[in-house]
């Protein structure tokens, strides 16, 4: 939310904003350089309230918790090395840090995402929906989902066969029984989300297997930015360079690097070059050009991977400043990056997710 608020007023904002929470406390800290006038405490309270943390008994009281804000400007050393204090042309802007980013795509779902991750993410979204619309009034904001899918490996491509296990652990109020929880989750969450063709008599459902989950949210567990980076990406498929996305403006290399390689991997699969692909990007701080770009199609490529890599390099501009322009990443004002903070950054049908737009890749079909 802080990223959106800054970009709405100043598209050149540089935001590296971290958040941590524990009982009755939210702390926001980091480095932000912006011309925007932002009330960070108001943002924190509104965000917590919108999530559903409206009283101490659900884990946090948005209106009465302590909010600590410690924001400084971006280091001038970083600023001069990366964007020259805003004097460099877009094609000259260097990476803001070292690191490697991965993009992944697979033809097992229409979203070109892993089915196990798509289902787990949709279950989480459905939990929020039935809590907020009152279908399951006993639900509270905290919860986790996990889906285990049985696959067939078709010469490197992953073909889903069935759902082996569905796991949902969700916070609840004191009044509901475990049997009621299980029945409601099956009827109102699992059935609307998981296609019947993937469920059978052997599918296992672990629904609140610990037996009790009343204490949750920041009261139950401390929270910190960047602790759930696999949920943000591909659910354990592909690979991850370790850098979190949330709280960072889109010029940060972890974020825009991951976005451009997702577009590249998705375009490889959507163009029929392969059924499954991973693209890796390697960066050095202050350097515009990537140190390396790597493509692996897991043996599913219609042409050799080295030829696919050549097509990718000819099609995509991996320089940081050009990524921001080509993906229109600096546009703010509509809660665009807030939407990425829950239910994943990839595989979403939303015009704001510009990195999900497929770029046609031209190649000679045999």
UniProtKB/Swiss-Prot annotation:
Its main location: cytoplasm. Binds 2 divalent ions per subunit. The metal ions interact primarily with the substrate. Can utilize magnesium, manganese or cobalt (in vitro). Its cofactor is Mn(2+); Mg(2+); Co(2+); K(+). It is found in: Cytoplasm. GO terms for biological process: one-carbon metabolic process; S-adenosylmethionine biosynthetic process. Keywords: ATP-binding, Cobalt, Cytoplasm, Magnesium, Metal-binding, Nucleotide-binding, One-carbon metabolism, Potassium, Transferase. It catalyses: L-methionine + ATP + H2O = S-adenosyl-L-methionine + phosphate + diphosphate. L-methionine binds at residues 31, 74, 221, 252. It is an enzyme of class 2 (transferase). Pathway: Amino-acid biosynthesis; S-adenosyl-L-methionine biosynthesis; S-adenosyl-L-methionine from L-methionine: step 1/1. One of its GO terms (molecular function) is methionine adenosyltransferase activity. Disulfide bonds: none annotated. Its EC number is 2.5.1.6. Transmembrane segments: none annotated. Belongs to the AdoMet synthase family. Homotetramer. This is S-adenosylmethionine synthase 1. The lineage of its organism: Eukaryota, Viridiplantae, Streptophyta, Embryophyta, Tracheophyta. The gene is SAMS1.
């Amino acid at each position: 939310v802080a990223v959106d608020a800054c970009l709405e007023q100043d598209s050149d904002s540089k935001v590296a904003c971290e958040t941590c929470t524990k009982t009755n406390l939210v702390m926001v800290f980091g480095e932000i350089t912006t011309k925007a006038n932002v009330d960070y405490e108001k943002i924190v309270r509104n965000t917590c309230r919108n999530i559903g943390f409206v009283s101490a008994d659900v884990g946090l009281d948005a209106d009465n918790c302590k909010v600590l804000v410690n924001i400084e400007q971006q280091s001038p050393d970083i600023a001069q090395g990366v964007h020259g204090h805003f004097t460099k042309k877009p094609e000259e802007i260097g990476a803001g840090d070292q690191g490697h980013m991965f993009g992944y795509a697979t033809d097992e779902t229409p979203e070109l995402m892993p089915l196990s991750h798509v289902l787990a993410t949709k279950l989480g979204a459905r939990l929020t929906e039935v809590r907020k619309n009152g279908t399951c009034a006993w639900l509270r904001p905290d919860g986790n989902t996990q889906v285990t899918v049985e696959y067939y490996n078709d010469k490197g491509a992953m073909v889903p066969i069935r759902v082996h296990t569905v796991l949902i652990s969700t916070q609840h109020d004191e009044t509901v029984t475990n049997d009621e929880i299980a029945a409601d989750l099956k009827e109102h969450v699992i059935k609307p989300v998981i296609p019947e063709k993937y469920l059978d008599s052997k599918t296992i459902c672990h629904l609140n297997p610990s037996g009790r989950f009343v204490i949750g949210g920041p009261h139950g567990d401390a929270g910190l930015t960047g602790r759930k980076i696999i949920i943000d990406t591909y659910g354990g498929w592909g690979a991850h360079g370790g850098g979190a996305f949330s709280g960072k403006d889109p010029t940060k290399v972890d974020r825009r690097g991951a976005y451009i390689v997702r577009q590249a991997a998705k375009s490889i699969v959507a163009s029929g070059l392969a059924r499954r692909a991973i693209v890796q990007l390697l960066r050095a701080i202050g350097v515009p050009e990537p140190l390396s770009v790597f493509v692996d199609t897991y043996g599913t490529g219609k042409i050799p991977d080295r030829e696919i890599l050549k097509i990718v390099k000819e099609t995509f501009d991996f320089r940081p400043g050009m990524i921001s322009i080509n993906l229109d990443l600096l546009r703010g004002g509509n809660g665009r990056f807030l939407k990425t903070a829950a239910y994943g950054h990839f595989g979403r049908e939303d015009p704001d997710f510009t990195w999900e737009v497929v770029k046609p890749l031209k190649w000679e079909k045999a």
